[in-house]
Structure formats: C-alpha cells, structure tokens
Amino acid sequence: MARLKEFYRDTVMKQLMEKFQYSNVMEVPRITKITLNMGLGEAVGDKKIIEHAVSDMTAIAGQKPVVTKARKSIAGFKIRDDYPIGCMVTLRREAMYEFLDRLVNVALPRVRDFRGLNPKGFDGRGNYNMGIKEQIIFPEVDYDKIDALRGMNISITTTAKNDEEARALLSAFSFPFKH
C-alpha cells in the first residue's frame, strides 16, 4: 500500500474528523483523482513534439497518457479538426498516492525560487489546480533527453464540499501553501 494512503487512513482522517466534527468517517474529504494535462500548441508544426511530451508524461505519471485532439478547426491558431494538441493522464488509487508523494516530497522542493503554492488555486468546490513551468523538476525525466521545457497543469479532485475542507486535507498531506 502507498505510504501516503496509509498516512491518510491512520492520521489525516482523525485530524479532519476532529477539526470539522464529522459524525461519519465517510464524510471525511479524500482525494479522488489527479489529472495531469500538457497543452502543446506548438505541436501544430511538428508531430515529434507530441511523442516527446508523451514520453515525458509517461515517465512522470507512470502510465501512458491520452493524446488530446482539437475539437474544431481554428484558422487563427492554424489548427484543424483532430489535430493532436496535447496529452493528459488521470491517476487514481495507488498510482495517485505515489505521484502525490513524489510531487510534494521530491518535485516541488526542486522548483527554482519556490515560495509555496498559490492558495488561490481552489475552485470553490473543493478541487485544487496548479501549474508547473518545467517538467524537469521530476527526477524521472532525463535532463539530457528533453528537447524543450514544457509545463503542465495538475488538477487535484477531492470529495471536499468547500475550499476550507480541501485546504485542510491538502495541508495535512504537507502541501506547502503560501500564507
């Protein structure tokens, strides 16, 4: 079992039960999924970019991403229907907890000039979104093999009812929020 999953079950649930006075353990918020999304607008000119992004994302997430395609043609962006314009991967269960562990304890401390995560990333319904500017903060990505620095969006979906509960949940997992 993943280290953070055990930590959640043994420690975080008890903390949140006391803090929010839940009457049932099923009321305690939990993380349901983590979605990684990499938008690749520059892939319009070069199809190799998608392959590199997919290999980076596979190394980071531990599972193969889905290539996202344009839904409709937009002449201003030089894209047509079904052009590959990004890739995404959804992590659940064990893989999700493993990724969360690596994100908080390994990747975020490697970000240059890191001052904490923006507390405004909550959406009002208990979910958190954050952006990463470079994929090289993950140790799984080989620095010598990357062709360009690419960022990604990380979406953490929880069962929390509001931002306060979600923030308490993520803080319990030692997310480094700015004050």
UniProtKB/Swiss-Prot annotation:
PROSITE patterns in alphabetical order: RIBOSOMAL_L5
Top-level division of the source organism's lineage: Bacteria
Gene3D superfamilies per record: 3.30.1440.10
GO cellular component, one term: ribonucleoprotein complex
UniProtKB keywords: Ribonucleoprotein, Ribosomal protein, RNA-binding, rRNA-binding, tRNA-binding
GO biological process, one term: translation
One GO MF term attached to the UniProt entry: tRNA binding
HAMAP family, sorted: Ribosomal_uL5_B (MF_01333_B)
Family: Belongs to the universal ribosomal protein uL5 family.
Function comment: This is one of the proteins that bind and probably mediate the attachment of the 5S RNA into the large ribosomal subunit, where it forms part of the central protuberance. In the 70S ribosome it contacts protein S13 of the 30S subunit (bridge B1b), connecting the 2 subunits; this bridge is implicated in subunit movement. Contacts the P site tRNA; the 5S rRNA and some of its associated proteins might help stabilize positioning of ribosome-bound tRNAs.
Subunit details: Part of the 50S ribosomal subunit; part of the 5S rRNA/L5/L18/L25 subcomplex. Contacts the 5S rRNA and the P site tRNA. Forms a bridge to the 30S subunit in the 70S ribosome.
Name of this protein: Large ribosomal subunit protein uL5
Organism per entry: Thioalkalivibrio sulfidiphilus (strain HL-EbGR7)
